[in-house]
Swiss-Prot record:
Descriptive protein name: Angiotensin-converting enzyme
Residues annotated as binding chloride 3: Y815, R1113
Active-site residues annotated for this sequence: E377, H506, E975, H1104
Family classification: Belongs to the peptidase M2 family.
Glycan attachment points: N42, N62, N80, N99, N148, N304, N495, N535, N573, N601, N643, N663, N746, N1177
Taxon lineage: Eukaryota, Metazoa, Chordata, Craniata, Vertebrata
Residues bound to chloride 2: R777, W1076, R1080
Disulphide bridges, residue numbers: C145-C151, C345-C363, C531-C543, C743-C749, C943-C961, C1129-C1141
BP terms from Gene Ontology: angiotensin maturation; bradykinin catabolic process; cell population proliferation; hormone catabolic process; hormone metabolic process; kidney development; positive regulation of systemic arterial blood pressure; primitive erythrocyte differentiation
Intervals, Extracellular compartment: 18-1241
Organism name: Gallus gallus (Chicken)
Amino acid sequence: MPAALGLLLPWLSLVGALQPGLEPPQSDPTEAGAVFFASEYNSTAEIVLFRSVSASWEYNTNLTTANAALQVEASLEEQNFTELWGKKAKELYGNIWSNFSDPQLKKIIGSIQTLGPSNLPLDKRQQYNTILSDMDKIYSTAKVCLDNGTCWDLEPDISDIMATSRSYKKLLYAWEGWHNAAGNPLRAKYQEFVTLSNEAYQMDGFEDTGSYWRSWYDSTTFEDDLEHLYNQLEPLYLNLHAFVRRKLYDRYGPKYINLKGPIPAHLLGNMWAQQWNNIYDLMVPYPDKPNLDVTNTMVNQGWNATHMFRVSEEFFTSLGLLEMPPEFWEKSMLEKPADGREVVCHASAWDFYNRKDFRIKQCTTVTMEQLFTVHHEMGHVQYYLQYKDQPVSFRGGANPGFHEAIGDVLSLSVSTPSHLQKIGLLSSAVEDEESNINYLLKMALEKIAFLPFGYLIDQWRWNVFSGRTPPSRYNYDWWYLRTKYQGICAPVSRNESNFDPGAKYHIPGNTPYIRYFVSFILQFQFHKALCQAANHTGPLHTCDIYMSKEAGAKLREVLKAGSSKSWQEILFNLTGTDKMDAGALLEYFSPVTTWLQEQNNKTNEVLGWPEFDWRPPIPEGYPEGIDKIVDEAQAKEFLSEYNSTAEVVWNAYTEASWEYNTNITDHNKEVMLEKNLAMSKHTIEYGMRARQFDPSDFQDETVTRILNKLSVLERAALPEDELKEYNTLLSDMETTYSVAKVCRENNTCHPLDPDLTDILATSRDYNELLFAWKGWRDASGAKIKDKYKRYVELSNKAAVLNGYTDNGAYWRSLYETPTFEEDLERLYLQLQPLYLNLHAYVRRALYNKYGAEHISLKGPIPAHLLGNMWAQSWSNIFDLVMPFPDATKVDATPAMKQQGWTPKMMFEESDRFFTSLGLIPMPQEFWDKSMIEKPADGREVVCHASAWDFYNRKDFRIKQCTVVNMDDLITVHHEMGHVQYFLQYMDQPISFRDGANPGFHEAIGDVMALSVSTPKHLHSINLLDQVTENEESDINYLMSIALDKIAFLPFGYLMDQWRWKVFDGRIKEDEYNQQWWNLRLKYQGLCPPVPRSEDDFDPGAKFHIPANVPYIRYFVSFVIQFQFHQALCKAAGHTGPLHTCDIYQSKEAGKLLGDAMKLGFSKPWPEAMQLITGQPNMSAEALMSYFEPLMTWLVKKNTENGEVLGWPEYSWTPYAVTEFHAATDTADFLGMSVGTKQATAGAWVLLALALVFLITSIFLGVKLFSSRRKAFKSSSEMELK
């Protein structure tokens, strides 16, 4: 109890004594004396009760310690009055009152003798009153608070959340918070209260408090009658429960709703799941019919609390009943006070026992539900007004259920569409069958849903009072009854540290509850009788007794009697029966009962909850995210808006980017950056809005997938100034790369394409190759090193702002595979033996060409000798490594040049390939707007081949500085593969216009190239004179493909190994280049041809590094393209070795591929993989199968030549490796100029790695050779170059 209240109690015990003039009189112990005694009691009781009720009103409308003390004082005075008058009545009439001839007098004297808490000694009485006051305050001041300090009151905050939120998490937070805040602190106090209350009523001759409460109903069969009524109503409830459970299943899914189990208690629109009408919107039978919830109309019409009470008053007066007295309007609390007072918001009607002061206390909000509550409370006051001239002892309902029923009877009329139309809240009252079902279901959600709750609360309390439910089982028994009768369960685990009954007002408020169950039966009996008096014809649910004086007269007779007659007699006078009966209720709901049974039969619903013990899981991340939007329809509207606006914004940026990439000028760069900023603003605006949704329980996976994708803002998450800096860095790095040139002493300058690329591809002059290789790295990579460091910082910051540990973690997340890195490593190890054999064979050929001075047969290969600037593809040195020079060589370049092929002819040929498969031809915009040759007008352009989607579903282009050769013909097919993918998924939402994973996009074109590059296909398009099918030709062909595909694999793997380590900090800024060459040595077996240092930045000499393009996609694509190829060849009916397959003109293969491409990013990539290959995993099996003949040949050849697999002389370089400079304390290590201590440490590390590497390589090579015909299986994801 409050400390201040404790100090006041000794004083209160004195002031609680009755004032002079209020004591019982001396009167004769006769029936005549009893008449005088009863008269004196009545006038005195009015004084005492007025004081007690006034004190209680003051406390309930201003919860302060002082008011609590005054309430306790007034309660003590009332109890002293009850005690003194009761004991006097017992003394004078205890032996004779039952023999009185006047039945009214008999009832009055009998009730005066029931003392209740007044039986208790003063100290216990004080304790009893204080417990009730404390419990009242705990309940009324309970709040649910958030981490940010915001707190919710029950009214209106929590009630609104329970009524309107559809967020599983938010509802759970409100439900759990309220039960913990309001219920748990009451547990010990309630146990004390039960002990004291039982003690008090046992002194009046009752077994316990429950027995006393039941005595008001004056029926020896009361409990049996209730059970009989409940059994009558149960089938209707079970059908309603099953229907509602199915609708909640549709909304929340199988995770949270079990169609054979109880319903989680927080999902039914009300804190106690006692009425379900607030979730009517989730289960409207006929949504196209007029909405019966007139809340919005009330708000729009400017209704306020006072007007709602005036409308209710007018209903009563229209029946010829009494209007509210002036005191009602002057003294009622009809709204929650705005002055900060703590009040008891629970709606209640008050009789001050002076026959003129009647009030309502309600924190009214303008809603339809509250309009009914207003009528309910006004019904109580009308009852008070009608029986105010009865003796105090008879100022009550005929039984407690009568009082509750009166206002609700009025609500049955008020809620009809015809009445709502009469008072201007509905434009029309359509009464067709569908509208009737809508109306009746809404009423059932209020009335029928309530019945088991109304029944069980006092079942629980009667068991508590009787001791059948001991304190150790308070909460267990509560939830047992709630599941047994209501078919609901707690949404979180509850135990005996909780006290969930206390979270319902009537428990701490000590208000018996069975009255509400009784009233829900009686109100329909009353309604039927009053409708008959009003001459209503038609179904009972359409009756409105508004303005019927006849109905009013019948009602008045019930009200005026108060409790002066038995309720059975009053009920009989109104209805013609003296028993409670569910017949009228069942008649009222008859149409919807039939409809519910039909609906449940259609969906084969289980009635009841046989899986009694089922409980829902706790939501992931709970209680985080409770304020997020969970309305799926709202999410769909948002995504529709996003899609249409994104198409415009993305198109504008892509156009500007195209202009810049095809004409590198400062102006075009500025425009591109401006459009990029606009796109970033759009991304961040919609990304932040997307983050406001919690899609975890959405039923449409597409909506969830897009929202999750949108929520990742990428670079747009950066502050605007840093975003501008980031974009400028990327633009500057890409520009530096694109305009870089290598100049000779005679001032002749060479761009990368086509000059340097041609030198690397065709020259066999060691020094000329070295000039191009070193010159390119000096001109490109070295110049962007400092910018790259800042780029890494900003990239990581953006990743962290998106919820990732670093940028590498974000890049890997695009593959939606937790084991992605492990899967890649497993794939690489499967493929490594093939690479090692190819490396050893090529190294021998280069040794034969360049000699021991430049090549070590046990060391790495100098990186500039492999025909490509980055040694990623070795196909340009095929002439040096050709296994059988006299056999047919597959090279279409001479024929292309001889036949006068042009870049456009190359693209047209590629288009023919795709259309031969039944795929989509290139649209006209493609031919009109693509840049397929390097412009001859001197413009600086980005030559790196790329395919472009302009996001308007019609404009797709390729930018390529095409050269007429076979290599570029393959590249053309690759880029056209991207465009075909664009065309296939162009009707997907913009968020899904992407590959199933980044590797898929890269693989599609290359799959075509695997067919295009076959001798059979080249012959069919007249680029090869003949197709020679023998082992030597096959090995030549497979070698040409392996120099492109297999040689690429370690490079495709290591590029992002390096970047991921840069992003996560494992590679520091001062070792960028050293670690780059460590990886190139480890995986590719390459070394730099000249010394390198940290002044160089060789990673930056590769386009994808300055351009910020992730690279692992290419490794992924090189694996999965063979899986695709194998599956498409099977669909095309190919027989024979996989490397001879050409799917040209196979519509079956085309359909398989097209169906997968149409998905875009709309499904996780394994589903697209399943569509094409029939299984969901990445695997190297198809690749190994494709190259099996070559692998067999390489192993044999290398064995014959005594080749060493790997590069055990890892520190060998083609220049002096032991050049020391004592003055600078540096050494040359792996081509790097580093400190001597670093070099020593590095040497030991690499020695250990080399030994492991050598042993592993030999083991894998032997293992593969001995079991090469076995399948290679793995799982993962992949891409291209």
